[in-house]
Regions:
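Secretory-pathway/membrane protein signature
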Residues: 1-174
């Protein structure tokens, strides 16, 4: 469920997480909102929230009945899937920064031990991802924006960010 404006960080994060955890997810219109969204996103309050849900309220017969419980409706697998979607969303919000490359032009990766040699087993696609990531670190794009441009889940970039920061190839833009 999008926020009233539909373009907040929570909207972007929710779509990104669901794209990678449930490719068949459904995007509802703001006009399909429930009472929480009506209150939190109302003019004058305008909290920029989007809603992530496994099944939309009111769209299953057990909704708001005694059967809407941990036995009949909510399964351990469903609860775990919801947990991981929300955890990933919170991680993205916490780690979403802008990064800037610290050198002019493409950095020389070999001297930093980051470019594969004949004796290393780094897959070529990892090198391509690293170089493409660096090319987008202009200080203007956030991590989630870069992930979207690279068509990868944001969480698959966390180790790369740490590696490049540790080698002082990129830094966070404050």
């Amino acid at each position: 469920m999008p926020s009233r404006n539909g373009n907040t960080i929570s909207d972007l994060v929710a779509k990104h997480v669901l794209k990678w955890t449930d490719p068949n997810f459904h995007i509802y219109s703001w006009l399909d909102r429930g009472s929480d969204e009506r209150q939190y996103c109302a003019p004058g309050i305008d909290l920029p929230i989007a809603t992530i849900m496994r099944t939309k309220y009111g769209e299953y017969p057990e909704y708001h009945t005694s059967l809407d419980d941990l036995i009949n409706v909510v399964t351990p697998q469903g609860l775990n899937g919801g947990y991981w979607a929300l955890r990933r969303a919170l991680e993205i919000i916490e780690k979403n920064r802008k990064y800037k490359v610290s050198v002019m032009c493409e950095p020389q990766m070999g001297k930093r031990g980051l470019y594969p040699s004949l004796s290393t087993k780094t897959p070529q696609q990892d090198v391509i991802l690293m170089m493409n990531f660096i090319s987008l670190c202009d200080g203007n794009c956030t991590l989630i924006e870069i992930a979207e441009k690279l068509n990868v889940p944001t969480w698959e970039l966390y180790d790369l960010v740490n590696l490049l920061e540790s080698h002082k190839i990129i830094s966070t833009v404050e």
